[in-house]
Amino acid sequence: MTSKINFISFAAALGFFFLPWVDFQCSDKSEITQSGFQTVAGGGSLGEEANLKVGDQKNDETRGSLDAALYVAVGLGCVILGLLLAVIGLLGGGPPSPALPALAAMALVLIGLQMKLGFPLEQKIVESYQKTGVEEEVAIIDTSELFAQEKIRIVYCPAIYFELGSLFLPICIAFLAMRPT
């Protein structure tokens, strides 16, 4: 039973990488969204409002022009390795690998760390405002001040929280398995 739950948990964690994680909004209108894979690859999808502004142009500007989120990339590697070990454990029928909770914990910490430090698109927005020169007299040092002045919000979509929850499940299972009976 534990092997099945571990497999489902890691498969779900991999699936949540395809869903939108981060939504960058300006004046409460979605400008760019990024899924987990897009944060790793350095891409993004233009929001509805941005698509109307751009018109018929492809969103090539957001593909490959952003830096990759390295912590998320290593977290994705942990999820893929965990899924592989979960499949081996499921097919082998033996006890679950003790590496599964460690891989889940590592991916959980790395994705959480990336959320805390900010995604590369956030730094790119700050750099673009500094390059365009928001007036030299008004030097905006803090990112939160810039975002407040320009009405920019970074909204984490529910899929990123589901990702963290699915990675937390193997850790909980490991702690429950250690409990004396």
Segments (PLM) and residue ranges:
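Compact integral membrane and secretory-pathway proteins
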Residues: 1-181
